[in-house]
């Protein structure tokens, strides 16, 4: 698969600032060894950004490197550069770095866009405030506190001095800018142009004075990147030295830019993880704004008689929990001590002992006056009527009680009371009929993938509803593969079909062809069902008449396989849950199971496979040869845990429940285009199962880069549910 790249201009088209888009980057650090400088934390990142500076005299430096970390290290050291490095651009596709003596604030610089480029600017050159004594300040203020113009550092007029740029390398004694080369008290200063005043400090504010927040800082999006004790913050897109769940791509609305202080979890004020291995996190010193101007989109709608969403805007006077126990006053520490006080949560209306939701919990709550019951929810407060556009669900949505009544494909839901017989057919308990109101989307069978409903369309008996998880409610990360909880194999016996033991051949392997050309692989999991990847059928309303499933073949070019092959049309396509990258294909007629065509077993729902288990992938995809022979090939991989997988991906990957990681035993082996949809087959207790599905990843069989597969065990219940209910 080829990836497009944009070439940098040979001479003087440079790059910078369009918008912030964090991508994970790994910073090397070894505990127990001398701590290495986390230089990437000293740069502000602007993704897909370029700059243009049309000046033939400007020099730049370029070199092939392995990562943005290397670029940052070279820029900070400034070794071998004929200029002071203020910024760099990293070309992700070509692994090349471009170092610049200018940044986005320099004169004559124009902004641009470059898909493959990320710009990093040294924060010291773009800050308009100082941290601590201001020893790192490299801004352009050149006037003293009393308004006197500064004397250039390389000049001896009107004042002779020893602070020459050549004597203080690295202190950026450029032009006549205010500096603090010795890190003295008082902050940046300069010699003045007034013969009567030798030197004077400059009026540059502390960053803690410039930055301000409203309420408890949940909407703060400023560039404060140090804690109140002066520790540098860890980047949100990194897991070193502290592992955490607040990944920018998982919480796109939390403002996780670079390593800036944020408050994503309802703490009293903004905070950050630190670069100190012994200090996981600390609060940041950000003052309250004098005028509490709050972005209206960040303020929950206030209600007094009912709650909207999670009830963060509830301002009513209910003061007991659901069972009638009175609430404890928020300004009291008896009988329960706590830090959720009116002082710490100024904008949360913590008056008296009224039920509130100051920390983003499921609903309004309070500490109770019962010493044996610390907190309780005020679930007796009714929910306000909400439109479907505001709907969301928590967990798997089994408690969702909204009024949406359409599927994700736009079909109108049918009444639950007309479908109770079908519902009883695939669940083994009596559903709560009180929740199955009218034709609203619900989750009576505890489906792991959210609310759904029956439809009046016989070809689509049921489907999921277009409801998202509530903000902050995300798919948890995968369990540790070193400690499997559920065995994936359902039996220790080999499967037998029609009295014939399943062959050691790969009879379950399917070649999906479009107009007689192989496009994807697939797995025959039932006589009438094939499991494959969604990417093989990108258009939801695609005409299936041009698609065929070829079974029982080894040579995708059909040579010498007339007797064993079965060619079946596809009658139906069922898309998997949102984000699953899976589809199930219903065959026009069942496959005939014989010595050349067989089914592959599915794993138990939610099971895990031990790390280092050897598995295999199969496919007819790209092999690196111009004239591929079209033969089915196999590559052996081993299951890899989350931590090790993340290391191989330079910290850019954190597996969740729906993903599985496997690395090649042979360098350069792995799935490529044409293999997508094919299976990752593992064996447990002498039973082979399809544990993963190949989907497009981060390149094709890249050395030391394990593949990320769809974890079939996470979707096993959905697969069984579809097979059971899609009868036509």
Swiss-Prot record:
Q: What is one Gene Ontology biological process annotated in the Swiss-Prot or TrEMBL record?
A: negative regulation of extrinsic apoptotic signaling pathway via death domain receptors
Cellular component aspect of the GO annotation: extracellular space
Summarize the PTM comment.
Answer: The single-chain precursor undergoes proteolytic processing by TMPRSS13 resulting in an active two-chain form. The single-chain precursor undergoes proteolytic processing by HGFAC resulting in an active two-chain form.
Is Glycoprotein there in the keyword field?
yes
Which residues belong to any copy of the PAN domain? 38-124
Q: Which Pfam families match?
A: Kringle, PAN_1, Trypsin
- Keyword check for Isomerase: no
Show where the Kringle domain sits: 129-207, 212-289, 306-384, 392-470
Domain Peptidase S1 spans what residues?
A: 496-724
The UniProt keywords, alphabetically, are: Disulfide bond, Glycoprotein, Growth factor, Kringle, Pyrrolidone carboxylic acid, Repeat, Serine protease homolog, Signal
Q: Which residues form the signal peptide?
A: 1-32
Q: Which residues carry this modification: Pyrrolidone carboxylic acid?
A: 33
Q: In the UniProt record, which residues carry a glycan?
A: 295, 403, 569, 656
GO MF entry, a single one: protein-containing complex binding
Q: Which InterPro entries match?
A: Hepatocyte_GF, HGF/MST1, Kringle, Kringle-like, Kringle_CS, Kringle_sf, Pan_app, Peptidase_S1_PA
Question: Which pairs of positions does the record mark as disulfide bonds?
Answer: 71-97, 75-85, 129-207, 150-190, 178-202, 212-289, 233-272, 261-284, 306-384, 327-366, 355-378, 392-470, 413-453, 441-465, 488-607, 520-536, 615-682, 645-661, 672-700
Role of this protein: Potent mitogen for mature parenchymal hepatocyte cells, seems to be a hepatotrophic factor, and acts as a growth factor for a broad spectrum of tissues and cell types. Activating ligand for the receptor tyrosine kinase MET by binding to it and promoting its dimerization. Activates MAPK signaling following TMPRSS13 cleavage and activation.
Q: Which family does it belong to?
A: Belongs to the peptidase S1 family. Plasminogen subfamily.
- Assembly behavior: Dimer of an alpha chain and a beta chain linked by a disulfide bond. Interacts with SRPX2; the interaction increases HGF mitogenic activity.
By what name is this protein known? Hepatocyte growth factor
User: What species is this protein from?
Assistant: Rattus norvegicus (Rat)
């Amino acid at each position: 698969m080829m990836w497009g790249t944009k070439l940098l201009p040979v001479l003087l088209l440079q790059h910078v600032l369009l918008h912030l888009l964090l991508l994970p980057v790994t910073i090397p650090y070894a505990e127990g060894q001398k701590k290495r400088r986390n230089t990437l934390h000293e740069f502000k990142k602007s993704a897909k950004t370029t700059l243009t500076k049309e000046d033939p005299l400007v020099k730049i430096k370029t070199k092939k490197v392995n990562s943005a970390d290397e670029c940052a290290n070279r820029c900070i050291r400034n070794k071998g550069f004929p200029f002071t490095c203020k910024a760099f651009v990293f070309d992700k596709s070509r692994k090349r770095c471009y170092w610049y003596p200018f940044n986005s604030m320099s004169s004559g610089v124009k902004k641009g866009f470059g898909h493959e480029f990320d710009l990093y600017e040294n924060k010291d050159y773009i800050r308009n405030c100082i941290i601590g004594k201001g020893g790192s300040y490299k801004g352009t203020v050149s006037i003293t506190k009393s308004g006197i113009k500064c004397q250039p550092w390389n000049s001896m007029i009107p004042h002779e001095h020893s602070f020459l740029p050549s004597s203080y390398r690295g202190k950026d004694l450029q032009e006549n800018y205010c500096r603090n080369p010795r890190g003295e008290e008082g902050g940046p200063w300069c010699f003045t142009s007034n013969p009567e005043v030798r030197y004077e400090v400059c009026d540059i504010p502390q960053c803690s004075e410039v930055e301000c927040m409203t309420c408890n800082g949940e909407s703060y999006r400023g560039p404060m990147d140090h804690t109140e004790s002066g520790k540098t913050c860890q980047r949100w897109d990194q897991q070193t030295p502290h592992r955490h769940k607040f990944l920018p791509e998982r919480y796109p609305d939390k403002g996780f830019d670079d390593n800036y202080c944020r408050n994503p979890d309802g703490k009293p004020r903004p905070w950050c993880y630190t670069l100190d291995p012994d200090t996981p996190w600390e609060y940041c010193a950000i003052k309250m704004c004098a005028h509490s101007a709050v972005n209206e989109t960040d303020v929950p709608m206030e209600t007094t008689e009912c709650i909207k969403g999670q009830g963060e805007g509830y301002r009513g006077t209910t003061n007991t929990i659901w069972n009638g126990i009175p609430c404890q006053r928020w300004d009291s520490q008896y009988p329960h001590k706590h830090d959720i006080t009116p002082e710490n949560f100024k904008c949360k209306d913590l008056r008296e002992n009224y039920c509130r939701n100051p920390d983003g919990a499921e609903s309004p709550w309070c500490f109770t006056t019962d010493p044996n019951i610390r907190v309780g929810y005020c679930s007796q407060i009714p929910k306000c009527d909400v439109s479907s556009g505001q709907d969301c669900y928590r967990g798997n949505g089994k408690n969702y009680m909204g009024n949406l009544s359409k599927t994700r494909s736009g079909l109108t839901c049918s009444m639950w009371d007309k479908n109770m017989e079908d519902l009883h057919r695939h669940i083994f308990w009596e559903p709560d009929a009180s929740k199955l109101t009218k034709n609203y989307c619900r989750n009576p069978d505890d489906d792991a993938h959210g609310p759904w409903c029956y439809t009046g369309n016989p070809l689509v008996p049921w489907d999921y509803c277009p409801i998202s998880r509530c903000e902050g409610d995300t798919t948890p990360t995968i369990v540790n593969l070193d400690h499997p909880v559920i065995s994936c194999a359902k039996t220790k016996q080999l499967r037998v079909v029609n009295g014939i033991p399943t062959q050691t051949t790969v009879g379950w392997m399917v070649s999906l062809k479009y107009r007689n050309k192989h496009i994807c692989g697939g797995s025959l999991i039932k006589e009438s069902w094939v499991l494959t990847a969604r990417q093989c059928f990108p258009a939801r309303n695609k005409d299936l008449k041009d698609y065929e499933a070829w079974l029982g073949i080894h040579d995708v070019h059909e040579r010498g396989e007339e007797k064993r092959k079965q060619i079946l049309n596809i009658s139906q396509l069922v898309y998997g849950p949102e984000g699953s990258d899976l589809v199930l294909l219903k065959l026009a007629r069942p496959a005939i199971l014989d010595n050349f065509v067989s089914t592959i077993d599915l794993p138990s729902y939610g099971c895990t496979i031990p790390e280092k288990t050897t598995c295999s992938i199969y496919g007819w995809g790209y092999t690196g040869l111009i004239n591929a022979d079209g033969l089915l090939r196999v590559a052996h991989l081993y299951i890899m845990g989350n931590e090790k997988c993340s290391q191989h991906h330079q910290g850019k990957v954190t597996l969740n429940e729906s993903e599985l990681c496997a690395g090649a035993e042979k360098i350069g082996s792995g799935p490529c285009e044409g293999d997508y949809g094919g299976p990752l087959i593992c064996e447990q207790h002498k039973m082979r199962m399809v544990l993963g599905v190949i989907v497009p990843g981060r390149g094709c069989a890249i050395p030391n880069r394990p593949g990320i597969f769809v974890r079939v065990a996470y979707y096993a219940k959905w697969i069984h549910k579809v097979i059971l209910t899609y009868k036509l």
